Amino acid sequence: MQKAIRENPEQCRILQNGQMHPLEFLTGLVMKETEGRAVPQVVKSLIKDELNISVIYMITTGGAISAVRNKDGTISAGDSTVLKTISEQIAPDTPLQVISAGQYLSEELEPSDWAELIVEINARISAGTASGIVVTQGTYTLSYTAALLYWLFSDSEVPIVITASSSLPLESTEAEVNLRLAIETASKEKNGVFVVYGGKVLSPLNLHFERPGIFSNWNLTSQKFRESGPVATQFSGISDLDQDVVSRLLAEASRKMFMCRLYPGFRSEIYNKMLKYSSVHSIFIEMYGIGSGNMTDSDYSLKPMLLTGNRRGMRFYCTSQQKINLDFSQYITAHGVWREGAVPMGYLTTESAVALYFACSLCADSDAELDEMMENYAALYSN
């Protein structure tokens, strides 16, 4: 390795300036000298350490943080150019590569967009070229994306920092402030998944939108950034992801799930009609309080929907509208829900539980395995 570095000073200089293609060239020289016995990932890591290389990848996906205001006053997704310009201004001494993984407003987020982001992150980690990754995204679906990346990449050896902005980059300093802290966090941390917003470093789990400019973590006694569970452990061993396959798996998962919220006047019959003629397998229900619901024999009872779902082999996963720990053991109304096989998702918020479902869908080989994984996580994230 040292011979390859010594004999190729120009390639090393380019590498130290943040252009990563010489890393493959130098790694190839080492592999040739060792007749293929060296491990490419280890070689890349050693070269980076030897040359003191610290490259941050910024993966952009759109949102207000890179959006533009049109002449008619409307807002549309921009491109990564503005983020590259801002990053060069706020972190001129940090080698940074900006990569686009789609440009859309966060309310337009679809499973295929997640697939592109997941594959891009995985590729940067697997290549051994990233010392940190910053992901920019819109605020409306930030709670879902942050949790998804936590479930998948919390065991990664590269820190991943997600950030966003509620205002446009040319109309406020919010994007600049958040990007600066995101880059600093990605440069400082060794691993884990983080969210940077409003001058704070937050956990990606149970991320809750309070109001423009403010996110917080609900229902956590301590912030969680690492070791989310078995899915992340399994995912960290995958080095080559096919984007089409990931997109198909996520699309299939979205087709087989449904989400509803209890409210005064909730009528099971409306949902039963949908469930009888659909391929839905997993249903998320936002319950009242710690898991209460109407389980009487009235027209406004949840019970008929649970019974219909059970007959069709569907699974019910419950979260709390009040964002508190679900506990079916106290209220008599919760006992009835539990009796029908509904699974309380502990202290996970709806967004984190739904993101967990998508993460498990990428690793499960069958509905039965998916059900088992979800129940194991429910137990793991219950107080």
Where are the predicted features?
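Active-site histidine-anchored catalytic micro-motif
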Residues: S54-N383
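Charged, compositionally biased, marginally structured helical/coil segments
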Residues: M1-I53
